[in-house]
Amino acid sequence: MGKTTGFKEFKRVVEPYRPAKERVLDFKEIYTEHDENNLGTQASRCMDCGVPFCQSNEGCPVYNLIPEWNDLVYQNRWEEAFERLIKTNNFPEITGRVCPAVCEGACVLGITETPVAIKNLECAISDKGLENGWFKATPPKNRSGKKVAIIGSGPAGLSAAQELNYAGHTVSVYERDDRIGGLMMY
């Protein structure tokens, strides 16, 4: 872990919301721009717990490798942090925004202090991935010859389709509505 005393030295600071009067006029992000210096500081608050509950069944439902990408953000190794994030999360650019951040509720630091700003860090990592073109199509090296049908194109259906495609299967996604996305669209 990067800064072993970061949790003692720094208080939690999250990105503030944009003013409501601005937000009602557009569909842009509700938070202000990320402050990269603050993000590194916030990532340094991760304590390298013996048992990181943030990424266990008590915390993140997709088992994100939270302490690992916190450390990489602290070290300013953003692309590696992005690679860790997408190992466990098919859509971090979406889940980082809609997730209720149970990982923060499970953060051990939260027992005595405010928890690490995990949700903000996840959003910042995925935003950097979008800005720098790190999201890439990754077709499988070999096809299995098997075909799979996925019913429903919401986050779960699209995640399943992506994982099955990585495994080499030919995947067809079926959706009853006029466009894909499920709850992300309607």
Which role does the model predict for each range below?
Residues 122, 162-163, 184-186:
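Short acidic, glycine/serine/threonine-rich loops at helix termini
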Residues 147-173:
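N-terminal Rossmann-like FAD-binding beta1-loop-alpha1 element of flavoenzymes
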Residues 169-185:
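Glycine-rich FAD pyrophosphate-binding loop
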Residues 121, 153, 176-177:
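Fold-independent oxyanion-binding glycine-rich loops
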Residues 1-147:
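Ferredoxin-type iron-sulfur electron-transfer modules and their immediate structural context
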Residues 90, 154-156, 179:
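Residue-level detector of alpha-helix initiation sites
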